[in-house]
């Protein structure tokens, strides 16, 4: 059975959205021209970079599959996959190499987990000075119920040998030219076998969309999506640290608080990016909205603790001078978005800044000032929403 979709850039944009990015361009096309996808912000066509419109996050704690963001590194992506002949290889520093069919994987004990998948460069468009790369707004993220099998169970079938150091993952996408480095990512062997890392075949109760990694994708809860390898077809156990380009050079951050340095600073050690950090957003009020003075107004939104749960969410209606604790919604697990809400009042007319701050269950709070690094990674400053009070 072959499953696939042809895809390419749409002839015309379905609509235009304005993103308040300091470095521009502010106008971006909305497209519905990609397979199994609804309305998404078009960042790039080849490889596909599609951003979730921010209003989607106000609708549910789970991000719908058809509006889940898309990010690929190479443009050579299979447009159809024969599920009958597909195999997942497990090899390297193991007792027995495996070549697993989808039926064999589906026969393993399944697990479910709700987890945020977020691009390392989510919100890169707000970095000042501007840095190269996709100028994402805040929609290069999504939250889904992932269903699959434990990576540990697959590795145990192969038998990881003593002395194993890391486990490397590769997918079906390919570089445009042979000289370019194949996209591969690695986890330390203990992390790979922690029982939470998953090989997923469903998201939100449906098979993975082709552009979100069908038929299999790695799920690494609490870590940035660079590790969530899509169209996973190769697992290699290594007996030495992985030094491939995507681990040693790309996706590295300054080894400093908040991964922050001064523009031009070079006297700093870089390390591979890994765990996510806390973030929170207002989803039902946007900058430029007009609110009524002297009446109770509802603010609501989402928060997540990065690699930990959400301990509390605080809201400020006066630009950070004072803070009130918001009411938290249902706890869907420590790796999930968590909804919050609060009623507040603005007594007088004028301009005001609304702010929201998340503190994780490990005690890590969002910082007051934005970080900066040359890759545009790991933004998690307290976000501000400028409103007019009338």
PLM segments and residue spans:
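N-terminal export signals
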Residues: 1-15
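Structured, non-membrane catalytic/scaffold regions adjacent to prosthetic-group chemistry
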Residues: 14-390
């Amino acid at each position: 059975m072959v499953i696939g979709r042809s895809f390419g850039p749409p002839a015309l944009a379905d609509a235009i959205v304005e993103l308040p990015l300091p470095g521009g361009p502010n106008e971006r096309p909305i497209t519905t021209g990609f397979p199994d996808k609804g309305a998404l912000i078009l960042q790039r066509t080849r490889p596909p970079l599609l951003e979730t419109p921010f209003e989607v996050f106000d609708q549910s704690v789970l991000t719908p599959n058809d509006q889940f963001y898309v990010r690929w590194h190479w443009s050579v992506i299979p447009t159809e996959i024969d599920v009958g002949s597909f195999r997942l290889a497990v090899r390297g520093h193991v007792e027995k190499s495996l070549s697993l069919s989808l039926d064999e994987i589906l026969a393993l004990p399944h697990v479910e987990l709700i987890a945020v998948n977020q691009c390392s460069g989510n919100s890169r468009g707000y970095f000042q000075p501007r840095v190269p790369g996709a100028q994402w707004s805040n929609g290069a993220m999504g939250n889904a119920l992932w269903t699959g099998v434990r990576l540990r169970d697959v590795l145990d079938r192969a038998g990881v040998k003593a002395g194993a150091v890391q486990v490397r993952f590769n997918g079906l996408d390919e570089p445009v030219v042979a000289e370019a480095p194949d996209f591969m990512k690695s986890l330390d062997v203990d992390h790979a076998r922690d029982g939470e890392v998953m090989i997923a075949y469903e998201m939100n109760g449906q098979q993975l969309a082709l552009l979100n990694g069908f038929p299999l994708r790695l799920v690494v809860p609490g870590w940035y999506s660079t590790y969530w390898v899509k169209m996973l077809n190769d697992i290699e156990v290594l007996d030495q640290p992985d030094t491939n380009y995507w681990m040693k050079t790309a996706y590295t951050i300054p080894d400093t608080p908040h991964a922050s340095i001064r523009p031009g600073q070079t006297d700093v050690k870089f390390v591979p990016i890994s765990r996510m950090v806390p973030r929170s957003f207002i989803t039902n009020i946007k900058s430029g909205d007009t609110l009524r003075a002297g009446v109770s107004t509802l603010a609501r939104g989402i928060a997540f603790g990065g690699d930990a749960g959400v301990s509390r969410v605080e809201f400020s209606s006066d630009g950070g001078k004072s803070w009130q604790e918001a009411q938290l919604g249902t706890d869907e697990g420590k790796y999930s978005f968590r909804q919050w809400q609060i009623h507040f009042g603005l007594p007088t007319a004028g301009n005001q800044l609304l702010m929201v701050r998340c503190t994780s269950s490990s005690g890590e709070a969002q910082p007051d000032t934005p970080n900066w690094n040359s890759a545009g990674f790991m933004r998690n400053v307290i976000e501000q929403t400028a409103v007019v009070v009338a």
